[in-house]
Every structure is written in structure tokens, then in C-alpha cells.
Swiss-Prot record:
Source organism (scientific name): Xenopus tropicalis
Membrane topology: Multi-pass membrane protein
GO BP annotations listed: protein retention in ER lumen; protein transport; retrograde vesicle-mediated transport, Golgi to endoplasmic reticulum
Segments in the Lumenal topological domain: 1-4, 53-58, 111-116, 169-178
Region (Interaction with the K-D-E-L motif on target proteins), start-end ranges: 47-48, 159-169
Full protein name: ER lumen protein-retaining receptor 3
Any one GO CC term of the record: COPI-coated vesicle membrane
Main location class: endoplasmic reticulum
PANTHER family in alphabetical order: ER LUMEN PROTEIN RETAINING RECEPTOR (PTHR10585)
UniProt entry tagged with the keyword Membrane: yes
Gene: kdelr3
Top-level division of the source organism's lineage: Eukaryota
Function: Receptor for the C-terminal sequence motif K-D-E-L that is present on endoplasmic reticulum resident proteins and that mediates their recycling from the Golgi back to the endoplasmic reticulum.
Cytoplasmic topological segments: 25-32, 80-92, 136-149, 200-214
């Protein structure tokens, strides 16, 4: 394990904590895409099915459990405790547009044609596009709260750091995971415009706004 991997995990965890604290303190899930959070819960579920069969390290096991629990707590807060504040009118991204191609690709491009491996591959592909409903929701409403933008920033930073992790591992171990790297690059690309707006607006105290779709 290297500093990029650890930093990426910390950034990922910070993003989730920021999101949960935002909802808990405001008693609202306004501005948060429940569909994106459902996809992330599905990502962690299908990726960590080996939780009780494969042991790599205590750190690895603990982080898996933390991400799983946080994902389902987030979904519960949105669709359960704070469901009255859920903005379903603007959270309208069609999930089948993501799930159908991701499922198909998981069967076509994987390292081993076994249930666990296909589900792991599915989770990697799905994570690369899981944020799209949230970005679509922001573009539809035209703006995002500062806390939501901080959440997205750390989520994007996590992916950038994981790309650095793969580069470092290739340099030091000659290890290359094509599926993870390509999916990570795709996911990072989705954040480029957001990173630019975050740096030029949010960090200067301005509200992030996006052009509304025609």
C-alpha cells in the first residue's frame, strides 16, 4: 500500500462524511441525488461480496465495512428519514441508460468468467458513471449548495489519487489493472468541468452554478 492509495481512501471517506453530516445537520437531503447514492450502494455491494471469503489486511476489511455501512445509511436517510425533502422532480436521470450497458460490458470484458469476478468488474464499470445522476441533477437545477460541491470535490479527488496509485504501482511493481485504470480515467473526465468551477468559484466564496439544459 502506498501514500496515494491511503490518501485516496481518506478523501473518499471525507466525501461520505461531508455528505452524511450535511444531511444530518440540515435534516434534509435537498440537492442530493438519491439515484447516484443507490448506484454507489450497488457498487460497494457487488465489489465487496468477498468480504467474508478473502482476507487481505485488517485495514482493507475495515474500510470495506465502513463504505458499505455508510452507503446504506446514506440511502436510508434519503429515501427514509428525510424522504420529504428529497427532490425527486429533478433527480430524473434514467438509471437503465447506465445499468444496461454496464451489465453487458461486465460480461464481455472481465478477467475471469466467474460470478464474483463479473460482479467485481460490474462494480468498477458502474462506479465510473455512478456520479452522472448527481451531475445531471445539478445541471438541471442550475446550481449546487457549497456542502454538496465539497462532497463532489473530495469524491473526484479520491479518483485522481487512485489513478496516481495505479501509476505508482506500475512504476514500482509493474502491476497494471486495465479495467480499473480505464474506468478511473473515464470517471475522472466527468469531474474536469466541476474541478474548474470549484477552483474558480467555490473556493472564492461564490455559489457554483451550471448552465441549465435546454
Amino acid at each position: 500500500m502506498n501514500v496515494f492509495r491511503i490518501s485516496g481512501d481518506v478523501s473518499h471517506l471525507l466525501a461520505i462524511i461531508i455528505l452524511l453530516l450535511k444531511m444530518w445537520k440540515s435534516k434534509s437531503c435537498a440537492g442530493i441525488s438519491g439515484k447516484s447514492q443507490l448506484l454507489f450502494a450497488l457498487v460497494f455491494t457487488t465489489r465487496y461480496l468477498d468480504l467474508f471469503t478473502v482476507f487481505i489486511s485488517a485495514y482493507n476489511t475495515v474500510m470495506k465495512i465502513v463504505f458499505l455501512v455508510c452507503a446504506y445509511v446514506t440511502v436510508y436517510l434519503i429515501y427514509g428519514k428525510f424522504r420529504k425533502a428529497y427532490d425527486s422532480e429533478n433527480d430524473t436521470f434514467r438509471l437503465e441508460f447506465l445499468l444496461v450497458p454496464v451489465i453487458g460490458l461486465s460480461f464481455l470484458e472481465n478477467y475471469e468468467f466467474t460470478p464474483l469476478e463479473i460482479l467485481w468488474t460490474f462494480s468498477i464499470y458502474l462506479e465510473s458513471v455512478a456520479i452522472l445522476p448527481q451531475l445531471f441533477m445539478i445541471s438541471k437545477t442550475g446550481e449546487a449548495e457549497s456542502i454538496t460541491t465539497h462532497y463532489l470535490f473530495f469524491l473526484g479527488l479520491y479518483r485522481v489519487l487512485y489513478l496516481a496509485n495505479w501509476i505508482w504501482r506500475y512504476h514500482t511493481e509493474k502491476f497494471y489493472d486495465q479495467i480499473a485504470v480505464v474506468s478511473g480515467v473515464v470517471q475522472t473526465i466527468f469531474y474536469f468541468d466541476f474541478f474548474y468551477l470549484y477552483i474558480t468559484k467555490v473556493l472564492k466564496g461564490k455559489k457554483l452554478s451550471l448552465p441549465m439544459p435546454v
